[in-house]
Regions:
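Short Pro-Cys-Gly-centered "Cys-loop" motif that presents a nucleophilic cysteine in a tight turn
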Residues: 1-69, 84-319
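Short beta-strand->loop micro-motif that forms the acidic, two-metal-ion catalytic signature
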Residues: 76-83
């Protein structure tokens, strides 16, 4: 069975220097994303997501880019790409056109009219930032939906990395597909699929077009990769702030953040020791910096819900 990447015995410093060099030689890298639609859902079901994955794989092969990570959200897109920005933007324009044609045939014309990439997206400037951005993308579905298994959701690349069971998943080569199956995948009259593609359950496999092996080489270990995705809360805040967003943390993550704030900001050992006024100040920090909902702020800061709702009346009904 194929195993994920392993480095020969080295010190942590040697591994980091090697990965820094790989980052410099492999770039440039960009985090391409669209703003979430406020009043529209892009993907209403798994069939639409499957079509998007297939068209994404086909389109990526047509441009001089590689996808390192991605997440299809219900109302927006995230991609970490390797290549020039102009190629990444061209890739998304072509993908958007193809998806728009598909949605039009489904009676949903115009659903992507307001979906665009920022033409001034800055290049990812360091290895640390690249790791942060990859972790942010992979984590996105997990924090947005309670039913998502971070490492088993098929509409995000999260399950590819450091997965020794990946090579045991069954798939077919495109040469084994019928003409009808190829048309169904490509949504084209004259289907042409890259021979490197593998297909599983009517969908091009993510491992066929996502360069997950490069991502593995850019993280120190599987353990550190998991830490970056699940535990590096400060990095999540940094990426969200850079994008004009607020981090989306669950209760456990907010609780740990609040405990740290109790010690570093207020000089108490725990949240439960904070006086009432300091707990209100903590709620403000959790809301404004960490994106907590009113109910989360009340639970974590140990305040009455009515107190928090009075402090933040505009979001009082958003549980």
């Amino acid at each position: 069975m194929e195993q994920y990447v392993k480095y020969p015995p080295m010190t942590e410093r040697q591994i980091e220097l090697m990965q820094e060099r790989l980052f410099r030689e492999s770039g440039p890298f960009y985090h391409l994303c669209t703003k979430p639609l406020e009043n529209e859902i892009i993907f209403q079901n798994d069939e639409e997501r499957k079509v998007a994955i297939n068209l994404m794989a086909i389109t990526a092969k047509e441009f001089n880019i590689e996808i390192l990570a991605f997440a299809l959200m219900s109302n927006h897109f995230h991609f970490i790409v390797r290549g020039e920005l102009i190629d990444g933007l061209s890739f998304f324009r072509r993908l958007k056109k193809r998806l728009s044609n598909y949605f039009s045939r489904q009676g949903r014309a115009g659903v992507l009219d307001m979906v665009d990439m920022d033409p001034d997206t800055p290049m990812i400037g360091s290895l640390t930032q690249l790791r942060n951005e990859i972790a942010y993308v992979i984590r996105n579905p997990y924090v947005a939906r309670t039913d998502v298994n971070l490492f088993a959701w098929p509409w995000c690349s999260g399950y590819l990395y450091f997965n020794p069971l990946l090579s045991s998943l069954c798939s077919k080569s495109v040469n084994e597909l019928s003409y009808k199956e190829k048309r169904e995948i490509s949504r084209a009259t004259n289907p042409e699929l890259d021979p490197s593609f593998r297909v599983r359950n009517g969908m091009i496999t993510l491992e066929s077009f996502v360069n997950y092996k490069l991502v593995e080489q850019l993280f120190p270990s599987a353990q550190k990769f998991l830490w970056w995705v699940l535990k590096n809360v400060e990095a999540q805040h940094e990426v969200a702030s850079r994008r004009g967003e607020k981090p989306n943390l669950n209760d456990d993550e907010l609780f740990l953040t609040a405990q740290q704030l109790a010690r570093t900001t207020f000089g108490y050992e725990s949240v439960k020791e904070l006086p009432f006024q300091q707990r209100k100040e903590l709620a403000v920090i959790l809301k404004n910096k960490w994106g907590a909902s009113n109910s989360q702020a009340a639970r974590i800061a140990q305040l009455d819900q009515r107190t928090v709702d009075a402090m933040f009346p505009l979001t009082a009904k958003r549980k």
